[in-house]
Amino acid sequence: MNVHNVQICSVAYTGVYRNGGYIMRIGIRAHDVAYAPLDELIPNIHKQGFHCMHIALTKSIKEFKPGVETMTPGLAMYIKELCAENKVDVAVLGCYLNLCNPNPEKHKEIVEKYKAHIRFASILGCGVVGTETGAVNEEYKYEPANHSDEALQCFIDNLRPIVKYAEQFGVIVAIEPVWKHIVNTVERARKVLDAIDSPNLQIIFDPVNLLYVGNIDKQDEIINQAFDLLLKDIAVVHCKDYVVEGDELKSIAAGTGGLNYPLLLKKIKEYKPYVHCTLENTVPENAVATREFMEKLYSEV
């Protein structure tokens, strides 16, 4: 599939596609939009037809240096006001740090950052605080030990108090399984959910993140399995695509690679009406075309 070969249809500027009463709420990562100050960035997201955004403060804000000390109620309320004025939901507040960092001092700093994001989210009114699932090294890189039972238990043990903290603020934490990280399969994600057993822990499902060169031929099975085992816990769907480059997968815009988007969107349409679907790995030049590809295909499946 390729967005350049798709016959684009005209849709409402709100960034949603209405079909039979169901709505897919499409968003974008704020740092994939051309940089602008917040009071221009969020209106620009709306003008491009997106209904929600995934925002990582350190990647999207350059007017000042975001940090725990800047995450005040006032900043949260300012962003919330801008979003309300422009009809843009905050689907995900990103806090993509390594909860299994083996350095005790760095781990302590990471925990404080998670707590700050949870407090911030409670005022901002976002869908979830999103995170990936870490690695057993300080560099946050792949090594086989990431997939060990010991690594999984480390992640569960370190995530549990974060989720407990989120419960106190009425905030949902959502983990995003990634093949190179500790939670690298649908089954391991289910184990984490069952072990922590909290309604404040849910899933960001990104099918491309669960693929590597050794299992791309099983992508349909993985998508189906995710909607079987994780169905009630999927809060957000990340939408990107992939191409194979050597022994690695390169992430690219949805509809321009090898992912089975008819299957994914059919599942979303059947089981997850109104779910936030945020695009990833777009660039300003193809973001709108990618949204239109998603909307047209969604109307057809």
What are these regions (language model features)?
Residues 40, 77-78, 82-86, 100-203:
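Active-site acidic/histidine proton-transfer and metal-coordination neighborhood
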